[in-house]
Structure formats: structure tokens, C-alpha cells
Amino acid sequence: MMDLDSQELWGRGPSMESPNNAWASVQRTPADSARTQQIVSPVVRQAESLGSLTLTDSSLSAEVKETMRNNYNERKMYEPGTPALEQTVWGAPPSQLDASISGLDTSMAPVASQSSMCDELHSEDLENWMNSRRKTYNPLAKNIVVVEEIPEREGILFKHTNYLVKHLVVLPNTNPSSNQTVIRRYSDFNWLQEVLLKKYPFRMIPELPPKKIGAQNADPIFLARRRKGLCRFINLVIMHPVLKQDDLVLTFLTVPTDLGSWRKQANYDTTEEFTDQKIDKAFISLWHKELSNQWNKADAKIDELLESWIKTSVLVERYERRMRQVSEERRLLGRVIEEFADNSVTLYPLEEGTIHDINSHISTISKHLNSLADTSKKERQEVEEHLSVKFKTFIDIIIALKGVFDRYKIMAGNNIAHLQRRVEINMDKLQSMESNPDVKGAEYDKLRQTIQRDKRTIAEQLNRSWLIRKCILEEFVIFQETQFCITHVFQEWAKMHVKYANETTESWEKVYANLQDMPLSRS
């Protein structure tokens, strides 16, 4: 549980497993390098059953699994012995702060009593604050960045793929005449993600698709998936109200030179966004403990929700593959019927007039099947290019929020409680020194400086803790807007089915009408 108000948050619990334990059921297998493998994503441990269906043979699950593995293992987020895991976030409540610690801004300490705040969660001020954040984010906005794969691969020994990245609208804080097309490679996208994680660790930074899965880095289907994943990544970044304003994001999208060379020469800022910031006391007055409870509940259920949506997306992909097979089989059926009609004349030489009439209608059936195959092909393409992308984008959004929660557990710690205790002890020593004439002045001054330094550190850490709290609330508020992605994707799904179902029905009605004249007897 991500309890921001708990004094024992950082005690080790079952959720903070080491990589070996957390990924015990996510072992690489030879099937990982093929597109026929079991779901072994971090939340879909084994081949999962869904009613009478077993969710196996899914390259999407491999993509999600590798993405999450990169997120947690390669970044070593669960590195044993991380000091922050044993620290508290908010320190002791005000009742435990020594009143003699002058100069400490205790107004930023966690408030034990909420009597001075609004009793109801959705107070008018808090609601206005949230509404102002909601208006900055529209997850249903159209993509404004296009990523296309350049066919020619570069490199002498190790070939790599380049991508043409084009933004379709004028970007914030850029000249309208800025270059709208740049060439980037996967490592450039990776660099952008890493600097965003350094600067904005408590923002919803989307994950990148895996660089490769087994030996699939040269597989055209895998490369197509990776290109789509990169496109989703950069569009989620540019939709984010804070990330889209970042200078390095704009550099990534506008600087026409090789980004690797630019990084070696340029001096760019990667300091955390909270540097030199002070928490607005108006926000502190808005805070309500129930907000922490909501986060904790979301954190407890996010894996379940992610698992369910992955299953949904897998089934959508499976439906797409079935449509491809249906389309091919309809064309095949049309050809087989044509062959039958060509050969049937030899079986009915005495009834040539009738059999020719029948065969002409059979030709109509063949054309109808080809028309249905074209309809199935269009539907499959629409699923692949639009619907499936929307399902996967929502996966990316959920994983981005999960990343915020997980990074909070690792990176938001402080040692306020330890510093408070040390200040109290040193204050007692200082008082005893004042009554002892034998104590040297240098020792007294040194202890007083230590107390003052610890007080400043406590104030700084309290300030940072509140800034983190505000940042995560902003992210959680704008995340609420993504609930409409669920509505949108299912509306689009139903609309698509109605469209192609109507086309299919009309086609069958036409062929049925034509077949009414097909001979049933000699009369």
C-alpha cells in the first residue's frame, strides 16, 4: 500500500520482492523468440484461462512482458539494500515535533488532525484545483506525431533501423518554421525516456516497446510492432501537459542533426523538476487524507486491471488474425467453386443449357465471396491500424501510472524521523553545555551549526515530500480522464462491427436475390 500518511511505509512487505522472486514465474523460454508463446507478463503469470479460452500464442504478451522486464530489472529498481526502503516519508506528526526546534517550518509537516481543513474531500477549492488540471489533458486527442520506418538499415557490423519522426502541428515554444521531420533511431527514443525519468520521476512516463525479443529484432512483424510502440510512446509524451513543454522533448522532435552527436556536444539539464521549487501553502490547505486512501486502493488493484485489459487486447488481436484467415478462406472458396463450375459441364453434357445457367449463377457466388473477402480485409486493416492501437495505448497508460506508484515506493523516502531525533538529542546536549562553564566555545559552535544544518535539511525534505505529493495528485487527476478511453474504444469497436456487418448483410441479400433465378428444375 502506498500510504503517504503512514509512519511505517517503508517496512519491507510482500510487494517489495527482489527481482528474482518477483519474476520467478516470468522466465525466458525458447518460445519467447517466437510469436507462439504463453502469456507470462508480470501480471499474467502463466497461460491464463478465460472461460473456455486459454490465452496462449500471443506476441502482445511478449511485448508487455519484455517492456515490464526492462522497466524493473534493467533499471534495478528493486536493488537489494536500497536505503530508501527503510525510511519514512513524512516523518513524525506535529505532536512529536519538539517545540524547541525553532526555525523549522512545521506547517509543511503531516497534519494529524484534519479539523483545520475541509471536512469533505470534494471541497469547492479542491474541486476547482482538480478541474484546472483536468483541462490540460485530453487522452482522446488525435496523434500529432507520425513515426515511419526507413527501409534502408544502417551500420557496418550491427545494423540498426532509422525512423522518420514527423510532427503534424506546431509544437509549444517552437518556431512555426522549425523542421517538422527528423530522423531518429531506437537509442534516441531510449535516451529521451531516460532523461524524462530523471527529470520527472513522479510523472506518467510511458514505457518503450522492447528493443528486441530473442532473435526477433530483424523480424518484419516485430519491427512493425516496435514502430507502432514508438509512435504510441512519443504521442503519449506530447499529450502530457508537463512533458510536452520540456526542452529536451522539443529538441528530440525538431533538431534535424544526429541526436547522438548532439548529445555529446550539448549541455542539457536533467535535474529533477522539484529543484529550487517551494510548495504552495494553498495546496497544503487543500489536502485531505482520503486522497492517499484512493491512491492506495488504485495501487492495490492496478495489476488486476492491467491483467484484464491485456487479456482483452490479446483477444482483439486473435480476432484480427481470425479475420485474416477468414478473408483468405473466402477467396479460396471462390476459386474452388469456379473450378467446380468449369469442370461440371463434362458431367452434364446432355443438359448443357441448364448447367450453363447454373454455372453463371455459381460465378455470381464466387464474385460475392471475393467481395466478402475484400470486406473482411478492410475490417482487419481497420482493427489493426486503429482499434488494436487504442487497446494497446490504454495498456501503455496503465503501465505509466503503475510506474509512478512503483517509483514513489523507491524514490520518495527521506530521513526526517532520524534527523528529528538527532536534533532533539543535540538540543539536549546544547542546553547542558550552556550550564557547563568548562565546555569550549568551538565545540559549542560546532554542535549549534549541526543543529541548524539538520533543521534546514528537515525543512528541505518536508518541502520535497509535499512537492511529490502534489505531483502525484496531479498525475492521478489527469489519469482520471483516461476513463473515457474505455468508452471510446468500445464505441469504435461497436461502430466498426455495425458498419461491416451491414456491408456483409447487404452483399448476402444481393446474392440471395440473384440466386432466386437459379434453375431448380427443367420447367
From Swiss-Prot:
Keywords: Cytoplasm, Membrane, Protein transport, Transport. Residues 1-37 are annotated as: Disordered. It comes from Eremothecium gossypii (strain ATCC 10895 / CBS 109.51 / FGSC 9923 / NRRL Y-1056) (Yeast). One of its GO terms (molecular function) is phosphatidylinositol-3-phosphate binding. The PX domain binds phosphatidylinositol 3-phosphate which is necessary for peripheral membrane localization. It is a peripheral membrane protein. One of its GO terms (biological process) is protein targeting to vacuole. Required for vacuolar protein sorting. One of its GO terms (cellular component) is nucleus. SMART domains: PX. This is Sorting nexin MVP1. Belongs to the sorting nexin family. The keyword Protease does not apply. It comes from the Eukaryota. It holds the Pfam family Snx8_BAR_dom. It is found in: Cytoplasm; Membrane. Residues 17-37 have a biased composition (Polar residues). Residues 141-260 form the PX domain. A 1,2-diacyl-sn-glycero-3-phospho-(1D-myo-inositol-3-phosphate) binds at residues 185, 187, 211, 226.
